């Protein structure tokens, strides 16, 4: 814990003093995660990291199935199972999983993304055996009943109405992704479509569970106050009896073809008060070498109100009320998003031109040392503060293991950022921020109904 406090103190000092020498920045490292890995006979990957600072444990199960694995006509299934996994199993009643955790002072949650579906819980360390039993029970005997399926389908549909259909600019992500990806599963979002959810059958849903929710498609991570030998023994006790899938886990063979020309899509939304523009540039996968300088470039371009996009479009030119961006770094190549919501009297086309000019600025001149060091300091801050809790450590290990195929990446990733030079930023900007690799979504408010 003292090492963490010291690292955080150094990190804060660096962020507040961006003119510090570069060699000082490169000395900073978060504490190493001294984990062990194990593989059960049924293929379950197990990662253990002891941390005896407090009597708490974070346990996570990541299933290597996300929305990109959904075949056409079955969108939303991965997210649906995020909900169904709480509806009971052979020995646990519906919603009882969470109630048991809450009754001992813990908490749990889940999330679905393009690549994975993740379940996580934090609880007092003396309940580890019970929690392993709970996770094994729903992995091996989930109650995928007609009643559960229909009730959770309605919950998911309502979530879609709230998050997408009734939200200003709620369709931006769906429309840009649909245009940017013609073949790959990133074409659609995890929430799925109403049409696919409505036509889904109970057999479709059971087939999806029986295909992907298997121990040989899962990674179990335990971080906190436990003894590894005992934790591994309990894991084998409760998970060994769950059979692996009889066939290899299917993966859609749908790589996105190279994009060689700009695509422009124009949409009008009735619940959109102001014009907007979104540009999606194709970028490499999460742990690819070029992902690191692109991530720093994303910070320089869109890392808060001091970033180039906000300062130019909102503060100086005042043509937009919001301007930002982010890199969607995923298991497969995805998109860097740059977007602007325009001010009154300004068009989305103006916004597109301004966004492109700001991104082109990274191509024409290397970033100066001060700006690059600030971005690196923010990266260090994120890494150090992002290892402060057992949950954050578990997430780092799980992501590296499932998405990066190597948990050791959790310990080596920061080093990639610290060696990035201004020339590296300029090189990746030239290669990836090119309009022939971009999809542009132009949004205008729909005319009021007469």
Describe the role of every protein-language-model region.
Residues 147-151, 167-174, 382, 402, ...:
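Non-catalytic accessory/assembly modules
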